[in-house]
């Protein structure tokens, strides 16, 4: 058998564990993970390379009904991805019925010829019988190429899933150099790490009304330290106070937690300078969304 290479999309309803699975497979923190919905905004590619194969994983936003221009962008990215990849991993939870959200996703799967593996995540949370029942229900809705039950957070059956993925990929050369784990810009990864901490620490409404813009990343010439300056933009003035917190304690907590992840990412000491500003209505500002990379030319993909 020759060398295999291909693109694999992770799709599913919000918070079924797509980003957690991607991070488990790569054993690197590339995709933002949080218990709150719609945490993944960009198609973060994670790249797994061995002597025998290279798999490029595309982590899509959860498919949902759009409520803003940003949401519309997220949906378009997810739909576009289904058409472009070599394989789709459709992730579900073992305690879910085939509700309106799943039917919506399955309808989109039926519109493309891409093979699909059904991945049942979080099997550590329910009895085996319930997992089997869930698989049976979903197999009645769609003809999957294969089915794998996993626990991404406990690393259960991850190697089995990788074997199934590789078996369905086409033969071909590598797309990326061996030491690549993602093709995302450095500033985007840093911004997503900071945003993840806001998702963990802040109230439900606030994190989805913010974006992070990394102004600069500089390595000091005289010391093994990286200086990062970043701005947190929120939609409402009231949110600004929540993000900063009493006596700046919340912003300090966000910064300290992000700094630890950034130091692990860079392998050296990081000095993180965070600022908070208000920018009303940014999620419906088409010009700003394009600047942030949330732009899509629909004609290109029709």
From Swiss-Prot:
Highest taxon listed in the record's lineage: Bacteria
KH type-2 domain boundaries: 202-280
One GO cellular component, as annotated: cytosol
Domain (Era-type G): residue spans on this chain: 4-171
Stretches the record annotates as G4: 121-124
GO annotation (BP), single: ribosomal small subunit assembly
Region (G5): 150-152
UniProt KW keywords: Cell membrane, Cytoplasm, GTP-binding, Membrane, Nucleotide-binding, Ribosome biogenesis, RNA-binding, rRNA-binding
Membrane topology type: Peripheral membrane protein
Binding site for GTP: 12-19, 59-63, 121-124
One MF term in the entry's GO annotations: GTPase activity
Region annotation G3: where it falls in the sequence: 59-62
Subcellular location: Cytoplasm; Cell membrane
Chain segments carrying region G1: 12-19
Subunit annotation: Monomer.
PANTHER family, A to Z: GTPASE ERA, GTPASE ERA, MITOCHONDRIAL
Stated family: Belongs to the TRAFAC class TrmE-Era-EngA-EngB-Septin-like GTPase superfamily. Era GTPase family.
Role description: An essential GTPase that binds both GDP and GTP, with rapid nucleotide exchange. Plays a role in 16S rRNA processing and 30S ribosomal subunit biogenesis and possibly also in cell cycle regulation and energy metabolism.
UniProt-recorded name of the protein: GTPase Era
Species of provenance: Thermoanaerobacter pseudethanolicus (strain ATCC 33223 / 39E)
């Amino acid at each position: 058998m020759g060398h295999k290479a291909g693109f694999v999309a992770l799709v599913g309803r919000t918070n079924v564990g797509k980003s957690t699975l991607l991070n488990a497979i790569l054993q690197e923190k590339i995709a933002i993970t949080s218990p709150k919905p719609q945490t993944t905004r960009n198609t973060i590619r994670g790249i797994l390379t061995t002597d025998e194969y290279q798999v490029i994983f595309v982590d899509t936003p959860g498919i949902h009904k759009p409520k803003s221009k940003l949401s519309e962008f997220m949906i378009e990215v997810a739909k576009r991805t289904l058409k472009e990849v070599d394989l789709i991993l459709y992730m579900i939870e073992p305690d879910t019925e085939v509700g309106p959200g799943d039917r919506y996703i399955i309808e989109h799967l039926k519109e493309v010829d891409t093979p699909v593996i059904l991945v049942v995540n979080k099997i550590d949370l329910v009895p085996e019988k319930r997992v089997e029942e869930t698989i049976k229900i979903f197999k009645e809705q769609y003809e999957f190429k294969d089915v794998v039950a996993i626990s991404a957070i406990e690393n259960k059956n991850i190697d089995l899933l990788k074997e199934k993925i590789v078996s369905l990929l086409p033969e071909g050369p590598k797309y990326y150099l061996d030491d690549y784990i993602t093709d995302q810009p450095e500033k985007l990864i840093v911004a997503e790490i900071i945003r993840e901490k806001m998702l963990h620490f802040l109230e439900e409404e606030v994190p989805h009304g913010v974006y992070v813009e990394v102004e600069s990343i500089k390595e000091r010439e005289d010391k093994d330290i990286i200086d990062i300056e970043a701005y947190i933009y929120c939609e409402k003035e009231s949110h600004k106070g929540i993000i900063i917190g009493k006596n700046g304690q919340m912003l300090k907590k966000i910064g300290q937690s992000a700094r630890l992840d950034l130091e692990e990412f860079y392998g050296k000491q990081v000095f993180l300078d965070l600022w908070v500003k208000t920018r009303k209505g940014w999620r419906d500002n088409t010009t700003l969304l394009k600047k942030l990379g949330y732009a899509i030319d629909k004609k290109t993909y029709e």
